[in-house]
Regions:
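Phosphate-ester processing/binding pockets and catalytic centers
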Residues: 1-262
Length: 262
């Protein structure tokens, strides 16, 4: 039986811990969830923006390479689309035991776990009897050089086996480790949307080389950010670790998060 949903996952920032020497303070992992029956709409959305911006037909849209005035119409289209977005925002300097996360892909795996939990809740709560498929999601990661997706499958398998011990909150009827694929953004248009979402939240939290953040992009996406009973934080936006909470509650640069995404 085929899946009901398709989930596209991409990231922004890096996993390094050399702050002040090139590593980003934040790492963002985002998912864009769409119904498989409407997946063609993601292709049309990207094609429409590409032609609006006068970009070559086959060239993938990379959010960071677009000018500010080109990013806005792209995000306006996403905000108006029939999809949902989930983002995990990791503040690396707040991690209590950074040495634990220097191990290869460890930080990435943690972010994948938190993202998978929220994606699975959305899919579980939005399945309907009319839907085609078995209620699960096909997960498409943006291909990262040097990473084997068998490793992610193995990691999710491990979480599934140890769900109770590790207090994993993934709904396994929605997320199935054997339904994971990795593609390059040029072959799956939804990945270009996931890149735009991850980059938007990254720019909202990560200061530029001149010390400024830009939160307009993240605010524009509010109509499609997953929420539960009006609550965004903990659902469509997961901040991690908890040690970053004080900073987010008090610093001026996170005002957008406190006001737009309560």
């Amino acid at each position: 039986v085929s899946e009901t949903f398709v989930v596209y996952i991409d990231e922004s920032g890096d996993e390094g811990f050399s702050f002040g020497k090139g590593s980003s303070e934040w790492f963002v992992l985002s998912a864009v969830i769409t119904r498989k029956s409407r997946d063609l709409e993601t292709v049309k959305l990207v094609d429409k923006i590409r032609s609006k911006l006068g970009k070559p037909v086959k060239k993938p849209l990379h959010f960071r390479d677009l000018k500010h005035e080109q990013r806005l119409p792209f995000l306006a289209e996403i905000a108006n689309a029939d999809l949902r977005a989930v983002s995990v925002l990791v503040h690396k300097p707040s991690l209590k035991e950074p040495e634990k996360f220097r191990e290869r892909y460890r930080l990435y795996y943690y972010a994948v776990r938190y993202l998978s939990e929220r994606v699975s809740w959305y899919c579980r709560d939005h399945r309907t009897p009319r839907d085609v498929g078995d209620g699960s999601a096909q997960i498409v990661f943006s291909n990262r050089s040097g990473m084997s997706y068998k490793e992610i499958r193995d990691y999710l398998d491990l979480l599934q086996q140890r769900t109770n011990i590790l207090e994993v909150r993934i709904d396994w009827s929605a997320i199935k480790p054997d339904k994971i694929a990795a593609c390059i953004p040029g072959t799956r248009m939804g990945l270009q949307i996931a890149d735009a979402v991850a980059s938007s939240f990254f720019y909202a939290v990560q200061p530029s080389q001149y010390g400024f953040t830009e939160d307009k992009y993240a605010r524009m996406l509010k109509p499609v950010v997953y929420h539960h009973q009006g609550c965004y934080q903990g659902y469509g936006i997961k901040l991690w670790p908890r040690e970053a909470d004080d900073r987010v509650a008090n610093e001026e640069r996170f005002k957008w998060l406190r006001e737009t995404y309560k």
